Amino acid sequence: MSKPPRRSPRKPTPASPELQLGHEVVWPTSPDAARLDRVANPQRDTDYLARFTAPEFTSLCPVTGQPDFAHLVIDYAPGAWLLESKSLKLYLASFRSHGAFHEDCTVGIGKRIAAEIKPKWLRIGGYWYPRGGIPIDVFWQTGKLPKGLWVPDQGVRPYRGRG
């Protein structure tokens, strides 16, 4: 039995100079300093949903400076552009030293992404862990859901404590 021919390893696509992907980058010091990159959507004529989940998002309380933690779920129906995931990771990490209330963080992230990629539709769910015994869940979306778009539940259970 003969062996199949050896295939040469796939050559990586050269990194685009416009993107952070494929390049060493400096961690942004604030959300305003962070850059969100977009790439062309090869399936722009098809309605579909893309989901990013950040289960360990952190920011700071603007009053006490104490850390706040959230599970973020970002759903969007892409238009001409896709959100590049490395830039999203860096953008979300920039909140680690940023003081803002839960509502401001969640809605601000949704608005910033929507402004950058101009999706057909976007929603963000911010499921914040309790501070002072009260969990805060924040939801925002750009508008009406495109007809026929399948959007699964965000899959984050309501906070139940230890019970």
Curated annotation (Swiss-Prot):
List the GO terms this entry assigns under cellular component, sorted alphabetically.
cytoplasm
What keywords were assigned to this record? Cytoplasm, NADP, Oxidoreductase, Queuosine biosynthesis
- In terms of superkingdom, the source organism counts as Bacteria
Q: Where is this chain primarily localised?
A: cytoplasm
Per UniProt, where does substrate bind?
Answer: 83-85, 102-103
Q: Where in the cell is it found?
A: Cytoplasm
The UniProt record lists the keyword NADP: yes
Q: What is its EC number?
A: 1.7.1.13
Which example biological process does GO assign this protein? Answer: queuosine biosynthetic process
Protein name, per record = NADPH-dependent 7-cyano-7-deazaguanine reductase
The pathway entry for this protein reads as:
tRNA modification; tRNA-queuosine biosynthesis
Q: Which GO terms describe its molecular function?
A: preQ1 synthase activity
Region of interest: Disordered: 1-23
Query: According to its UniProt record, which residues of this chain constitute the active site?
Result: 61 (thioimide intermediate), 68 (proton donor)
Provide the family line. Belongs to the GTP cyclohydrolase I family. QueF type 1 subfamily.
Q: Where is the composition biased (Basic residues)?
A: 1-10
The record's function comment reads: Catalyzes the NADPH-dependent reduction of 7-cyano-7-deazaguanine (preQ0) to 7-aminomethyl-7-deazaguanine (preQ1).
Q: Which reaction does it catalyse?
A: 7-aminomethyl-7-carbaguanine + 2 NADP(+) = 7-cyano-7-deazaguanine + 2 NADPH + 3 H(+)
The protein's matches in InterPro entries, at most eight in alphabetical order, are given as:
GTP-CH-I_C/QueF (IPR043133), NADPH_dep_7-cyano-7-deazaG_red (IPR050084), QueF (IPR029500), QueF_type1 (IPR016856)
Tagged with keyword Chloroplast:
no
- The scientific name of the source species is Rhodopseudomonas palustris (strain BisA53)
Q: Which SUPFAM superfamilies match?
A: Tetrahydrobiopterin biosynthesis enzymes-like
